[in-house]
Amino acid sequence: MKPRLYAIAVAICVVLWAPFGHAQTTPVKALVLYDAPTTGSFQKLSFAYAIMLRNLLGHWNADVDLQPVEQYASGQVEQYDATFYLGGIYDNQVPLTFMGDVFNTQKTVVWFKYNLWQFAWNPNFDFAGRYGFTYSALRGMNAAPTAENPAPGFFDTVDYKGKALVKYYDFQNGTINADPDIGVTTIADPAKATQLVTIRNPKTNEQAPYIVRSGNFWYFADVPFSYIGPRDRYLVICDILHDILNVQHRKQHRAMVRFEDVSALVLPSTMRRLSDFLFNRDIPFSIAVIPFYRDPLGEFNGGTPMEVHLAEATRLKRALKYATARGGKIVMHGYTHQYDAKRNPHSGVSGDDFEFWDIVDNTPVLEDSVEWAGARLDAGLLELKQNGYTPFAWETPHYQSSPNSIRAAVSRFKTTYQRVVYYTDDTPDLSASNPARDFAVGQFFPYVIEKDYYGQRVLPENLGNIEYDISDIDPTSNFNYTWQDLRLNANMGKVVRDGFASFFFHPFWLDPEIGTPGMADFRRLVNAIDALGYRWVDASRVGAPQPAN
């Protein structure tokens, strides 16, 4: 199998107020409002952000409603414990009724990025008098990038809990893969407003508030759901939601590890080495199993098509027998982890290609339906069951499938263990030529999501995986992602008070013909996560978030 790294990127305070309790005895009621303009090519972008926020709220026992801000009705904020407004579209008109209700309510309100000027500069509201801070301006790039100065800089570094979380960007080819815009605010009355988090502009040495709180009102200088990463300011919203909702979870940092793409071609010797290492360290682990191996084009079999059902997969069953006896738990990782007899997009081989998404055309596969996907899931479950295996969770191949496929999985698995791609429609049209196009957004989680937008329970994988440049063997595998990179991700992830360090590892990195230091680097990474103070846990036994003592 060819190793692949699929990086899922997003295309994309002190006045009297009434908290709603420290211990969560009833669901939090939350309203997420988003911009929904009827013109332009970003009509659904804020909806995508709203889905991502809704997912994070699924870490709590929460009832969440999503609604265009244009449809806001008078008095709605009083029906919810917390209302969030995602200002994702510049100067999208915010209803005056909403601003009036925000000004008068004692309920929690969180405003992100754009359009605060419509509220703060409106003479009908004494914004500065009420909240103790002012809105100054919108800031973006320090200058337009040029060949001579391709990285002019912007406010890109968020300081939080002693760590510098930097927005991801890449100036190659003149493309900046980050959102440089922030809303700049100024504290006018420290008795009313507090700058909770700071954002810095390293090129100009300027600082600005990233999060301001004035009693029940919170303001974020940007929308923290664009271009997210494991070292990004996205971790701030993941953590500080505990304070916004005023529902605290037990502070603990746990770690999980999963062996990936374990199929009929796995070498039992590599699984023995990996299993023994973890077993001797008393570290639980999971195994992502592909039940039915297919190479319909003969890509790795000299041009001859090859299929191996689990019942015939002698090497795989030997490996699983050894690993499960040492604590390994089974995750079902697709049925075949490839699609049809075609390249989708690489080889058509199990573990290499997408199964439930046409990645070549970036659309659902032709057969896509809940029934079609369900039949594949049932076939995979049957192969596992007939051979004595019961998976505790589902993992989508390459973390991307259609909404129909996701719903098929929800009805069959209580738990998933993965990252997820979300869509702004159940039958998404992602073509750039469509002015009202949909958006697909990839999201990882630093903690357990009890219920996401599609109804899934999601165990986190948030660090990524070790990758090596083996382009001399496979020209398309030319990417290095080191154990040190994952260690850095784990270190940054500690800002989340109940965050995980969860990663996966491909056993084939131990294959002699590949010639990488896979085993040594795996050991180093496990030791590094230990040294950071994480506690290894069995993914199959991870329960709901626990309230703080």
Where are each of the predicted segments found?
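Catalytic beta-strand/loop cores that center a nucleophilic Ser/Cys/Thr
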Residues: 144-215
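C-terminal domain-boundary segment and adjacent tail
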Residues: 66, 241-251, 269, 273-295, ...
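Catalytic domains of cell-wall/extracellular-matrix polysaccharide-remodeling enzymes
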Residues: 364-453
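Catalytic grooves of carbohydrate-active enzymes
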Residues: 254-264, 268, 371, 378-393, ...
